[in-house]
């Protein structure tokens, strides 16, 4: 995609320079987003853990959801996958498929959401791609993490007789979506806000995942 295709400096390279390059400023492996790929050197004694989730407007989020919330949710559901493997996050790659009529302030809000959460979780952008499309708005993110070699939490270690433990409350996110759609009535205002927040912003349990490494026989993420 060229600048001429989208006009007004909102083409791929202009958007990368203005909105995405700053997200990679503190990530040496990203090489300033000036090359075709990132160069990542694994920490000695660590295994790399890769996770990818995609989100599509009207399927995984509402079309009127704030772009900041969409970006943060996209990052967090991937970080939750890393947490389920006992991994610490290192960075991420993001691919964005933007409808041709998507306003530039939506994209700016999306980048702002990524910036807010990458700062919160101490990571940075490694690379990605942007494409203009007839629609729908689609987003894909790959999270990269590390875990002590051979210590990744797997699903296949579960066995009959194991104690099953759940962190958090199952169903809060789904209830939050129903609340946003007006499908729940009579809810306390504070509870409704809490449920909607859980829908928008799942909490990656990175510290818990790390704590469970070497202790739990199996683990799975159910945040999304």
Report residues per predicted region:
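Helix-biased detector of long, well-ordered alpha-helical tracts
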Residues: 1-224
């Amino acid at each position: 995609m060229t600048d001429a295709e989208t006009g007004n400096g909102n083409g791929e390279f202009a958007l990368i320079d203005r909105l995405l390059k700053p997200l990679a400023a503190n990530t040496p492996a990203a090489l300033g987003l000036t090359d075709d790929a990132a160069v990542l050197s694994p920490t000695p004694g660590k295994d790399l853990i890769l996770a990818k989730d995609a989100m599509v407007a009207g399927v995984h989020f509402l079309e009127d959801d704030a772009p900041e919330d969409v970006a943060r949710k996209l990052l967090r559901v991937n970080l939750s996958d890393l947490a389920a493997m006992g991994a610490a996050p290192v960075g991420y790659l993001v691919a964005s498929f933007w409808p041709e009529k998507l306003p530039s302030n939506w994209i700016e809000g999306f980048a702002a959401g990524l910036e807010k959460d990458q700062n919160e979780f101490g990571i940075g952008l490694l690379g990605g791609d942007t494409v203009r499309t007839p629609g729908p708005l689609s987003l894909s993110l790959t999270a990269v993490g590390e875990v002590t070699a051979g210590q990744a939490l797997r699903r296949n270690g579960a066995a009959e007789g194991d104690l099953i433990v759940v962190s958090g409350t199952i169903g809060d996110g789904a209830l939050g979506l129903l609340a946003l759609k007006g499908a729940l009535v009579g809810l306390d205002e504070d509870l409704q806000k809490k449920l909607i927040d859980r829908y928008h912003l799942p909490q990656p349990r990175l510290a818990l995942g790390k704590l469970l490494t070497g202790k739990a026989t199996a683990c799975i993420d159910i945040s999304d």
